């Protein structure tokens, strides 16, 4: 993790470590494996990858959280197969902990209001034809305010987005 701002996140180190430890307890459940083995998804997930999901566990030996140059530093080093799986959860954890501290009073109503303001702007500045071709997907897991807020955004987008909402990268 490279923090590109001057915002000091070192106070998050204990909570980041605690949340990362929870990852080590995660594993794909049997019902989830049945879901990914559904024939409808055959073209998206190879049999080897589906079997891999059943075996995979986050290995905390590869994650190092420290303070460097007055900033939080998170390094994941080890076999690529294991390290790449940490990227999104690590970024989501840091983002959510940071936002919980920075915006402790944030409300879902504020998230919805801001989203509807953006919808209004789009409707005012784009034609119906442009909106009919305007396709958007949600990829905000790494930078979301919170999981609850992201769920709300996805629900509102799927129901009320004036263009074409394609879906989300985060089905959970």
Indicate residue ranges for each PLM-predicted region.
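Ordered alpha/beta subdomains of enzyme catalytic regions
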Residues: 1-172
